[in-house]
């Protein structure tokens, strides 16, 4: 019985976290007029079991750490206002306190993907460069023997 109650609590907090993530994304996109925040993505929301607070993981598509910190500070200062807006959209007795946390995993993943793509392109360029040189070396080494073999094969048909 205790196990079943705990499972329900966790599924409830998970459902609340998902709904909170959707509502936060809409509020930040449509209702926030603060130019300091700009374009923000809500990656994940982790709600405490007692619903007293929610960690909101956000990403900005900025690489400059000073700009990212400025945007995060703007979100943190606007957290009570954002909480009020979201509370009006959700049917909760207690609205969690919002704690915004910068999530660098998406930006870091994109950076790693770009690095992998660059290495692959460099390898392809080296293969083409050395591949064409290898072909010209083969032609020089084999010389006319290849052409003679081709002529002999044509005559047998």
Swiss-Prot record:
GO terms for molecular function: ribosomal small subunit binding. The keyword Cytoplasm applies. SUPFAM superfamilies: Ribosome-binding factor A, RbfA. InterPro entries: KH_dom-like_a/b, RbfA, RbfA_dom_sf, Ribosome-bd_factorA_CS. Pfam families: RBFA. Residues 135-157 have a biased composition (Acidic residues). It is found in: Cytoplasm. Keywords: Cytoplasm, Ribosome biogenesis. One of its GO terms (biological process) is maturation of SSU-rRNA. Residues 127-157 are annotated as: Disordered. One of its GO terms (cellular component) is cytosol. PANTHER family: RIBOSOME-BINDING FACTOR A, CHLOROPLASTIC-RELATED. Belongs to the RbfA family. NCBIfam families: rbfA (TIGR00082). One of several proteins that assist in the late maturation steps of the functional core of the 30S ribosomal subunit. Associates with free 30S ribosomal subunits (but not with 30S subunits that are part of 70S ribosomes or polysomes). Required for efficient processing of 16S rRNA. May interact with the 5'-terminal helix region of 16S rRNA. Monomer. Binds 30S ribosomal subunits, but not 50S ribosomal subunits or 70S ribosomes. This is Ribosome-binding factor A. The gene is rbfA.
